[in-house]
Amino acid sequence: MEVPRLSQHISTPNSPCEEMIKNLSLENIQLCERDGNKSQDSGIAEMEELPVPHNIKISNITCDSFKISWDMDPKSKDRITHYFIDLNKKENKNSNKFKHKDVPTKLVAKAVPLPMTVRGHWFLSPRTEYTVAVQTASKQVDGDYVVSEWSEIIEFCTADYSKVHLTQLMEKAEAIAGRMLKFSVFYRNQHKEYFDYIREHHGNVMQPSLKDNSGSHGSPISTKLEGIFFSCNTEFNTGKPPQDSPYGRYRVEVPAEKLFNPNTNLYFGDFYCMYTAYHYVILVIAPMGSPGDEFCKQRLPQLSLSDNKFLTCTQEHGGLVFHQAQDVILEVIYTDPVDLSWGTVAEIIGHQLMSLSTANAKKDPSCKTCNISVGR
């Protein structure tokens, strides 16, 4: 979706943007300061006769758009020329102190048939709570407006990335994935106490848990998909897992075919960085027909097991051969329980590098490599 940049100097409701926004019924977009229930803008007069919007409805919500409609008293309805829409992130609903004044949350739209689509990645982010209120207005010949009182304030939350958005993100990840290297095991590092607890309280079986908030804010798997994190990247010179880890000094290594085989499906989950040169790709492996598989089918792009840029499983010489992308760090989520007896647990000889942990890591919203233009 192409969205024009906003003018750097937005002063009054009379100053239009340089271009109209595609698929957006907002022909003029600019700041319209609001304090309390009535507009205090110097170019706006107040007039009780204009109908006040009520029974506001929000529908067709995506990660960067929504439709809005409302009911109005028919009195003076034919005098309405514009709608003023006050859109704020929920935490800012009682404040008009904005860090970036060129990013409008007060929108002026020509009066069009309802519902009206509001779209724009420069003021809407995925999975974010917003408040919205509406005024009706009548533009006068001198450029001033007469306006109604503000409607009630309602709240809504934008959606996660769709498969279309994730496919765009995946294509950016494919561009830097690099050549494929062989690997033979998936591995997971934790503290010794973790593995002791698994043996004593879970019958030697690691259980899936909810994914944290790391990665893209709009990723549909964050805090929703249950799984177990594994790594598979290898050192270039040895072809083996690295000796260091940020997650603990004990490591379980599981033969790759135990988790990744023709009876599993593979999905792309996310692509992000943490203000460093390293980029991370999250992949999901789900046994066919499992609850995790059903979750991913509805939300994530599915990858071919044998032909993709990140992680492959191919049949060669009567056995399975595995490859992983060299130039990105793969984080693999396996959606079913894993028995420790499938592999081996041992202490690593390297160091625990806590600074490399991605637990609840925040994505760099300014990185051009791993962001798409539908929020961060």
Curated annotation (Swiss-Prot):
InterPro entries: FN3_dom (IPR003961), FN3_sf (IPR036116), Ig-like_fold (IPR013783), PHYHIP/PHYHIPL (IPR042868), PHYIP/PHIPL_C (IPR045545). It comes from the Eukaryota. Residues 52-161 form the Fibronectin type-III domain. Belongs to the PHYHIP family. May play a role in the development of the central system. This is Phytanoyl-CoA hydroxylase-interacting protein-like. It comes from Xenopus tropicalis.
